[in-house]
Curated annotation (Swiss-Prot):
The keyword rRNA-binding does not apply. It is a multi-pass membrane protein. This is ATP synthase subunit a, chloroplastic. Belongs to the ATPase A chain family. The chain crosses the membrane at residues 41-61, 100-120, 138-158, 204-224, 225-245. Keywords: ATP synthesis, CF(0), Chloroplast, Hydrogen ion transport, Ion transport, Membrane, Plastid, Thylakoid, Transmembrane, Transmembrane helix, Transport. It comes from Oedogonium cardiacum (Filamentous green alga). NCBIfam families: ATP_synt_6_or_A (TIGR01131). Key component of the proton channel; it plays a direct role in the translocation of protons across the membrane. HAMAP family: ATP_synth_a_bact.
Length: 252
């Protein structure tokens, strides 16, 4: 993995033998040693911050529920309605309600994680090694979310169809079995690398531009990063719902 990206300051002259170099670190981690295992400490720290923020916001918004929602309660109900519509569209009217909590958790965690990476000045917090960033900036987080999605759509299909779920691998013809199996293995890969790649690329571009021109030039890209972060959360949740809906639909 790339460890360092060196950027020559634009104010240097080729005639000057001493070059000012800015550095953007990639792939460095703060490790916590637990027995024989190493954990990525900065990912756990930012994940706990995101989860804590979501839990506190939810408790504040819904601690005093009213028949006519106002303020934060109104906002949380709008988010819930949006997630219900997404689940209904992707999974279908018969099964969607039981999957609203799962898709809602996925969407909100990815959305808040992405925005935390785009909006919060994580780099102001110094660590012994590595630096804080969005949880979704780490491949371990995105792979975990993708594998959780894979387990969910296998569970949904087997729960509804039993072992008959695996008939889908030989439909419409038997010789498509390898391709159908490969498709199921490629789904978590595409989910995880799409999210990881977009978030990492956005943070790298902003980091490089801030190192080169630290004032106003990076602002438009930072705003674009906020927009794409929201889109990536929507894409991840939509595809998760689509995979679950595909696993429980009847094949004729």
């Amino acid at each position: 993995m790339i460890e360092h990206i060196f950027i020559f300051n634009n104010s240097t002259s080729l005639s000057n033998p001493v070059f000012d170099i800015s550095e953007v670190a990639v792939g460095q981690h703060l490790y916590w040693q637990i027995g024989d295992y190493q954990l990525h400490g900065q990912v756990l720290i930012t994940s706990w911050i995101v989860l804590g923020g979501v839990i506190i916001f939810t408790l504040l918004a819904n601690s005093d529920l009213k028949p006519l929602p106002v303020g934060l309660q109104n906002f949380t109900e709008l988010v819930t309605e949006f997630i219900r519509d997404l689940a209904k569209t992707q999974i279908g009217e018969e099964e969607y309600l039981k999957w609203v909590p799962f898709l809602g958790t996925i969407f909100i965690f990815v959305f808040v994680s992405n925005w935390a990476g785009a909006l919060l000045p994580w780099r102001l917090i110094e660590l012994p090694n590595g630096e804080l960033a969005a949880p979704t900036n780490d491949i371990n987080t995105t792979v975990s979310l993708a594998l959780l999605t894979s387990v969910s759509y296998f569970y949904a299909g087997i729960r509804k169809k039993g072992l008959g779920y695996f008939k889908r691998y030989i439909q419409p013809v038997v010789f498509l079995l390898p391709l159908n199996v490969l498709e199921d293995f490629s789904k978590p890969l595409s989910l995880s690398f799409r999210l990881f790649g977009n978030i990492l690329a956005d943070e790298l571009i902003v980091g490089v531009l801030v190192a080169l021109v630290p004032l106003f030039v990076p602002i438009p890209l930072m705003l674009l990063g906020v927009f794409t972060s929201a889109i990536q959360a929507l894409v991840f949740a939509t595809l998760a719902g689509a995979y679950i809906g595909e696993s429980i639909e009847d094949h004729h």
